């Protein structure tokens, strides 16, 4: 998986999951992308990443918990691994979801919480913290939305896809 980011200079960047970590490239000119840095990680065919502010958060089915990457110097060609955040036995994750409106990321298909939805606070972006979980069913993928109007105004709702078991809606976090 991959996500885009814009540096302070206005140049465009992509952060992409690779077999052994995450690659970062400048894509300001999409016909001439330039690899600028990479962050090593576990060997896995499945790496997922989300960008929130000046940080990228990577997960993998190979382990390492949440890889926290500082993108503040990306314009200078540097991406720094802040930490491999592990908590409560968390190591592997299938998917990571972000909600920029709330400042939370969510883990799906992790090795803890029965593979359910895990809420992670980014109050301190360099040190994400697990603050809740829904472990009734495995969650393969999700979309989390903060409603601004209507009957759900001010609420963060998670649409959780449980594979062949259907779709479940949750109040989050």
Regions found by a protein language model. Give the residues of each.
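Feature marking well-ordered beta-strand scaffolds used for ligand recognition
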Residues: 1-173
């Amino acid at each position: 998986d991959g996500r885009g980011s814009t540096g302070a200079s206005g140049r465009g960047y992509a952060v992409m999951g690779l077999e052994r970590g995450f690659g970062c490239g400048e894509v300001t000119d999409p016909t001439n992308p330039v690899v600028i840095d990479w962050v090593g990680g576990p060997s896995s065919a499945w790496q997922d990443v989300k960008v929130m502010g000046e940080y990228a958060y990577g997960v993998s089915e190979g382990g390492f918990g949440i890889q926290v990457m500082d993108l503040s110097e990306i314009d200078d060609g540097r991406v720094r691994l802040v930490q491999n955040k592990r908590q409560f036995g968390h190591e592997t994750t299938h998917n990571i979801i972000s909600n920029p409106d709330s400042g939370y990321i969510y883990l799906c298909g992790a090795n803890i919480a029965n593979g359910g939805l895990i809420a992670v606070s980014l109050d301190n972006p360099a040190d994400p913290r697990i603050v809740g979980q829904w472990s009734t069913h495995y969650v393969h993928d999700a979309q989390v939305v903060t409603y601004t109007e209507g009957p759900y105004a001010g609420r963060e709702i998670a649409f959780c896809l449980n594979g062949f078991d259907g779709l479940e809606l949750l109040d989050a976090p």
